[in-house]
Amino acid sequence: DARNLNFIESDVYDIVLLLGPMYHLYNDEDKHNAISEAVRVCKAGGIIFAAYCNNDTTMHQLFVQHKLFDYLDCIDNQFHAISKPELVFELYRKEDVDRIMSGFDVYRLHYVGADMLSNCFDEAFDEMTDEEFNLYMKYHYAICEREDMIGLSFHMLDIFRKE
């Protein structure tokens, strides 16, 4: 349980991976506790990776799949998901992540779109030659940190250093 790592001493790891828990935490206290524990077990100067599911690509996917009306009771008037456990995933916008992180003594190194649009092109990737795929990956790495492009990703990765 990422919210309580009391079986781990403080300041012991050079790298901490929080890859998954934030997808399934629905209240601010739980989110804060998970980040707090990741920061606590990380050494000063260590790196923490925290992954999030993107709100707006999910909204787009619901439109494309003609399913948005099925979830209107879980979406506010600004199309921000009101996530709850029975829906499985908590969805975030960058401002949500920034709000969660605001109270921690950390320095953001990178905020990236982890998969960008690859979720939409599963079959196309299977059909690519190695040369095409390598070129796509070069493109992916060129755009994955661009602030105007991160919103295209289904998953975001916040990489920060403990001060």
Where are these regions (language model features)?
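A short SAM/SAH-binding and catalytic strip from SAM-dependent methyltransferases
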Residues: 14-29
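Active-site micro-motifs of SAM-dependent methyltransferase domains
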Residues: 4, 23-24, 55
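C-terminal alpha-helical "lid/dimerization" subdomain adjacent to the S-adenosyl-L-methionine
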Residues: 69-89
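Conserved class I S-adenosyl-L-methionine
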Residues: 47-75
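Short alpha-helix
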Residues: 87-105, 109-111
